[in-house]
């Protein structure tokens, strides 16, 4: 009986002492003009961030030129703080890989590397250790996308640097058709997982049901080392006559809380527009689904992920660095999320 008691105690001690990841919190910077704003930089200091993921540009296919071209590249009005390393991020529209062959992907890889190097210097940095490629690849584009990644790795300007990619939930579950990118690590994008265009009450930014469906039985077996990206953003999804009409960048917390403009449905995230609102291109009768993220959402998501991610050094990246978004979360809130890993 004594031996059984010791065994039971040992099991409980083992379960209670599950090894934790060493988490390095930081942010994405997704604006087109980098300014070293005191309030935003204070968040980097507050969370002892050592790096910042900075969107350098989008890449899309230009039908007139018949070439992939840079879209809205960032400019640096200020240098990035000396104590912060830059991790450049390039977003590539998936359709690009349906339009070009492997010879063109080689040219694109070379141009991206040179463009990134120039932008990193504009940011006040002489070098960088990691380049991240953001692309929601599919079964149809994976071969050319993976070839492009191989071409990047072979570029002499990237010698000694690592390449990471973004990873969506469907690419984890559908690993056979999606394949595994030929890179050192990926970052799991835990947002934009619901059906944005479907009319209804769902929060398309973060949906626990979708996470269960796509990750519960698959995440633990994913072969790459994984960092994690979590959302802290909010947006206004507009519907007209029950049909998706877009995301309005002119609707924020001030507008959605204006009772002369909107009437919130009871116990709902749907808001009816009471008058025409030309400043946002909206008409009376339009419906806005106001989607936002709470501390409780982040806590439940981080707890869920911690069950299936192996303990290791891991970047935890919040999307994105913006004072208006971060004011919804206290330092204590964020520290609790970090502690869950």
Named regions from a protein language model:
Residues 37-61, 122-123:
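Catalytic domains of carbohydrate-active enzymes, especially glycoside hydrolases
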Residues 150-252:
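Substrate-binding surface in catalytic domains of secreted glycosidases
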Residues 25-29, 50-54, 84-90, 131, ...:
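Hydrophobic faces of well-ordered beta-strands that scaffold small-molecule active sites
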Residues 30-32, 57, 91-93, 136-140, ...:
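Active-site beta-loop-alpha junctions enriched in small/polar residues
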Residues 2-8:
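Sec-dependent signal peptide recognition
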